[in-house]
């Protein structure tokens, strides 16, 4: 009698535990599906912009919850575009007063000194991905007006030195090409009421041989710090042509 009671009691406990696990999984799946349906913002034509992968959704949530976010991943994951989209949304809402866009002037051996024209003309080719996001959300004409008024500021990373960026949404793109000193300088510009997003691809470093990437070092040093989120995306988050994922896999030695 006691054995039978004990057996049924244990069986009931096992059934309850399994039910709880199934319910937990169901709840998580349901929650993830809801996240896909959640609107990030609308573009300049009123069309809804949503996350296209789970990695992108987690990335957006990280920007909502943290003042400093690292978005790391290969080409095509939307890490830069989504950062700009979210920055534009915060500007629209009045959560920030301006957007500051920057990136290091290191691209496959080139430097700004060898490019023609004034500062804007020199910087523009390096910031094209950032412009694309702004034009999508705000429209080309409004983006240009905001740049002219200084609400959107676009500058090389070197121009960040000595500044404190309050009430701003600051994006550092191509951060894998920063040095240790540049990354430290940039991160310490964070002011009150501001958010920073640092994007980069650790497999696409164009720094001179022997120079360590400031992005790699920052990820190691700042992992686990409260208020900082390090979001790593992979080929499953690539939303470009299907061949892009295959190319990334081959170059990274993944079959």
Task: Give the label of every model feature segment.
Residues 36-48:
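Conserved adenine-nucleotide phosphate-binding loops and their immediately adjacent elements
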């Amino acid at each position: 009698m006691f054995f039978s009671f004990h057996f049924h009691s244990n069986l009931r406990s096992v059934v309850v535990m399994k039910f709880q696990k199934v319910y937990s999984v169901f709840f998580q799946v349901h929650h993830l599906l809801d996240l896909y349906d959640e609107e990030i913002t609308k573009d300049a034509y009123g069309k809804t912009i949503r996350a296209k992968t789970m990695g992108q959704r987690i990335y957006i949530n990280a920007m909502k919850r943290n003042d400093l976010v690292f978005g790391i991943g290969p080409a095509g994951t939307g890490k830069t575009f989504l950062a700009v989209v979210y920055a534009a949304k915060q500007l629209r809402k009045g959560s920030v007063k301006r957007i500051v866009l920057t990136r290091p002037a290191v691209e496959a051996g080139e430097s700004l000194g060898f490019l023609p024209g004034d500062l804007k003309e020199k910087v523009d080719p390096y910031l094209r991905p950032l412009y694309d996001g702004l034009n999508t959300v705000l429209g080309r004409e409004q983006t240009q007006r905001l740049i002219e008024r200084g609400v959107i500021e676009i500058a090389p990373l070197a121009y960040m030195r000595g500044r404190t960026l309050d009430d701003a949404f600051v994006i550092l793109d191509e951060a894998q090409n920063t040095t240790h000193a540049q990354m430290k300088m940039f991160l310490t510009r964070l002011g009150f009421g501001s958010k920073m997003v640092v994007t980069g691809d650790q497999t696409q470093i164009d720094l001179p041989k022997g120079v360590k990437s400031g992005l790699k070092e920052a990820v190691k040093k700042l992992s686990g710090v409260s208020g900082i989120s390090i979001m790593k995306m992979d080929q499953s988050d690539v939303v470009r042509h299907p061949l892009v994922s295959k190319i990334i896999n081959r170059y990274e030695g993944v079959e």
